[in-house]
């Protein structure tokens, strides 16, 4: 019998954290965060990082594992995450992958290949200079010409991954997206139970807007001031995260606070839309609509599925 793994995905602000804690308590689980911002130390408010109080003594993995100045790839996440899963299984507990970063989830639950060994430093430097001179959208549009799937899947602000996709195509002549295509993509040693929380779009957007306001009230600006004092700049991968880059623009007097807050809200809403598009393309996902099912019903369904299958 295959080892069970529970995946709980969904867009930002849909309510994954609270449900995941309740599930871990019911199913004797430990949580592995699949969130591309919660990996960073010192970046708590803008990433909506789960607090010690919210954890309620449930072990969490893949949170606060790298410093803001460090580069961190999906391959890095896979390497560390696989070790964490083995540790959880060794304790005879249920591994629970919780988050909204689809690439991170797939790295642990799919037959994913990374092409990190092939590099062209000269071409990469050239692309970096293009992005610096013309903006991230410029190199992102270059990707459209050679790899429509990667163009659609990779956000323009994920400059590192956009450049990697262009680099891989130049080296191999094959689209970056083709490395993980094929019938064996979803083949895994685990029995994956994959659930995605959804709700009415307008309700979700309202929750997102309110959460951004709460982040500002809770000290996001002060958090960014401290990060800036420590020498972290907007050019770093971590500082490209929604909420951080906008406040840094404000602190650099490039935009007003009003503009920064509205950009964070718009960016978060757009991100939620992209997340849902990602999950809808995955045939493994069972969607649980919070407008149709109560929190108690959702909890009960997942617990029953895991327990009885």
UniProtKB/Swiss-Prot annotation:
Interaction with substrate tRNA, annotated site positions: 101, 124
Key word Magnesium present: yes
Catalysed reactions, semicolon-separated: adenosine(37) in tRNA + dimethylallyl diphosphate = N(6)-dimethylallyladenosine(37) in tRNA + diphosphate
Residues binding substrate, per UniProt: 12-17
Binding-site residues, ATP: 10-17
Cofactor(s) listed: Mg(2+)
Enzyme Commission code: 2.5.1.75
GO molecular function, one term: tRNA dimethylallyltransferase activity
Assigned keywords, A-Z: ATP-binding, Magnesium, Nucleotide-binding, Transferase, tRNA processing
UniProt-listed HAMAP family: IPP_trans
Function summary: Catalyzes the transfer of a dimethylallyl group onto the adenine at position 37 in tRNAs that read codons beginning with uridine, leading to the formation of N6-(dimethylallyl)adenosine (i(6)A).
Family statement: Belongs to the IPP transferase family.
Protein name, UniProt field: tRNA dimethylallyltransferase
């Amino acid at each position: 019998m295959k080892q069970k793994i529970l995946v709980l995905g969904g867009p930002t602000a849909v309510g994954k954290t609270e449900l995941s804690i309740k599930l871990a308590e019911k199913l004797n689980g430990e949580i592995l965060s699949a969130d591309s911002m919660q990996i960073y130390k010192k970046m708590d408010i803008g990433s909506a990082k789960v607090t010690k109080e919210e954890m309620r003594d449930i072990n969490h993995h893949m949170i606060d594992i790298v410093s803001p100045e460090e580069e961190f790839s999906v391959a890095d996440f896979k390497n560390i995450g696989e070790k964490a899963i083995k540790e959880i299984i060794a304790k005879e507990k249920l591994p629970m992958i919780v988050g909204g970063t689809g690439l991170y989830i797939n790295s642990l639950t799919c037959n994913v290949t990374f092409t990190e060994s092939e590099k062209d430093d000269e071409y990469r430097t050239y692309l970096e200079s293009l992005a610096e001179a013309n903006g991230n959208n410029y190199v992102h549009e270059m990707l459209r010409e050679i790899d429509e799937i990667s163009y659609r899947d990779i956000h323009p602000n994920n400059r590192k991954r956009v450049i990697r996709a262009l680099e891989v195509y130049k080296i191999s002549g094959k689209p970056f997206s083709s490395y993980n295509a094929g019938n064996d993509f979803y083949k895994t040693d685990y029995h994956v139970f994959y659930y995605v929380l959804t709700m009415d779009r307008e309700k979700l957007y309202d929750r997102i807007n309110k959460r951004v306001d709460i982040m500002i009230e809770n000290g996001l600006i002060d958090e960014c001031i401290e990060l800036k004092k420590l020498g972290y700049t907007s050019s770093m991968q971590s500082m490209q995260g929604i909420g951080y880059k906008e406040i840094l623009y404000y602190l650099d007097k490039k935009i007003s606070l009003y503009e920064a807050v509205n950009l964070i809200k718009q960016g978060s809403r757009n991100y939620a839309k992209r997340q849902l598009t990602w999950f809808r393309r995955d045939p493994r996902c069972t969607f649980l609509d919070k407008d149709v099912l109560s929190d108690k019903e959702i909890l009960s369904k997942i617990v029953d599925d895991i327990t009885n299958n």
